[in-house]
Regions:
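Charged, alpha-helix-forming regions
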Residues: 1-112, 119-172
Length: 172
């Protein structure tokens, strides 16, 4: 599903390539048949935010938001286990799940990195993606709430991910 790939890209560390491709994103968003008006509005607002800031400022905000504030970590098992020994097996299980689906991870990030999780969700059909993400719903809600409380520009993106991790969407 293209929405998950788009969210994955937008939640990565901002670089010049992202800035260069910003004008293409609204067109790609228009091709996403599975987004609702609120999701589209949040995504377009975030794209406007990216376009309105210098790259160095975007990078500084990203680092401050996700790398310097543990409560906002994009490594989801960190929220569940911290540095507990149980985190390792959870990471291994997630990596094995990716391999079971034939997805080769070509990044230095751990398998629980949210942009990587969203990229994997893009390989799944709608219902599979919702079920997969629903396993992380509580963590996504905490992360979304933390970003909203901090008035982070990333709050809208996490709100979309949280909403898509709700099994009640299966009935729709």
């Amino acid at each position: 599903m293209q929405i998950y790939k788009l969210l994955s890209v937008l939640l990565e560390y901002p670089d010049q390539e992202l800035i260069d491709h910003l004008p293409e994103i609204p067109e790609k968003l228009a091709q996403c048949a599975d987004t609702d008006a609120a999701e589209e509005a949040a995504l377009l607002q975030f794209i406007d935010y990216l376009a309105s800031q210098p790259l160095t400022e975007l990078q500084a905000i990203y680092v401050q938001t996700f790398d310097m504030t543990a409560e906002n970590s994009l490594h989801l098992t960190h929220h569940l286990f911290g540095d507990d020994k149980n985190r390792g097996p959870a990471l291994i299980d997630l990596g094995e799940l990716y391999r079971d689906y034939g997805v080769e991870v070509v990044t230095n990030e751990l398998p629980d990195y949210l942009p990587l999780i969203l990229e994997f969700a893009a390989y799944l059909d709608d219902n599979e993606a919702m079920v997969f993400l629903s396993d992380a719903h509580k963590v996504l809600k905490v992360l979304s709430d933390n970003l909203r409380e901090a008035e982070s520009p990333y709050a809208g993106l996490l709100s979309i991910v949280e909403g898509r991790a709700t099994l009640t969407r299966l009935a729709a």
